[in-house]
Amino acid sequence: MLLIPAIDLKDGQCVRLKQGDMDQATIFSEDPAAMARKWVDLGARRLHLVDLNGAFAGKPKNLEAIEAILDEVGDEIPVQLGGGIRSLETIEKYLDAGLSYVIIGTAAVKNPGFLQDACTAFSGSIIVGLDAKDGKVATDGWSKLTGHEVIDLAKKFEDYGVESIVYTDIGRDGMLQGINIDATVKLAQAVGIPVIASGGLSNLPDIESLCEVEEHGVEGVICGRAIYSGDLDFAAAQKRADELNGELDNA
């Protein structure tokens, strides 16, 4: 089970939003590269970056901070990024800079042809981000709810060749209410590619619950507010996940 620390970037700083609201941002660090180093030193095996300004602007807005993070840890672990990725040129720029994966969210839902082109051009590097509330997909930084069922879109995107899916339960993100395990497993069982859970991770029991369903295709979980607020000790959580994986593998 991959525990993936999130570094959300707003105006060059590492922040956390409450339910996607740019006006409800808590600044956790003015040095995102130092934050990346901290998580890697604590045992992170992948990082999840979000360009929040980019997500709302539709184009890269935190390049300097992203490049600083890649300079710091990009040679050591894979780094993935979402937010504002709307063109093949942007993807190419990011991958050339050292990102391992780019996450396409709103653009995948609104313009499936773009996602298909991206999967063809950058095979193995494209992750789809599906944000949902009550099983329905949301777009545009969560401000718009669509009529699309998450599972239907996930199957379609799997056929395009996406590497994996980051699934966020909007109702729980940044609220420390616990991961929506049932919805995540349902999605993972419906597709043959890995699913990364996101939204609401709050404590060690959440990690333990996710490890129990890893066999269904839940590859990892994005750790956000809980590791910044201190509700979850990242190093202890990764250690526990590794212990559980060992126990399950030996069972």
Curated annotation (Swiss-Prot):
GO terms for cellular component: cytoplasm. It is an enzyme of class 5 (isomerase). Keywords: Amino-acid biosynthesis, Cytoplasm, Histidine biosynthesis, Isomerase. SUPFAM superfamilies: Ribulose-phoshate binding barrel. Its EC number is 5.3.1.16. GO terms for molecular function: 1-(5-phosphoribosyl)-5-[(5-phosphoribosylamino)methylideneamino]imidazole-4-carboxamide isomerase activity. Pathway: Amino-acid biosynthesis; L-histidine biosynthesis; L-histidine from 5-phospho-alpha-D-ribose 1-diphosphate: step 4/9. The active site is at D8, D131. GO terms for biological process: L-histidine biosynthetic process; L-tryptophan biosynthetic process. It catalyses: 1-(5-phospho-beta-D-ribosyl)-5-[(5-phospho-beta-D-ribosylamino)methylideneamino]imidazole-4-carboxamide = 5-[(5-phospho-1-deoxy-D-ribulos-1-ylimino)methylamino]-1-(5-phospho-beta-D-ribosyl)imidazole-4-carboxamide. It is found in: Cytoplasm. It comes from the Bacteria. Its main location: cytoplasm. Belongs to the HisA/HisF family. This is 1-(5-phosphoribosyl)-5-[(5-phosphoribosylamino)methylideneamino] imidazole-4-carboxamide isomerase. It comes from Burkholderia cenocepacia (strain HI2424). The gene is hisA.
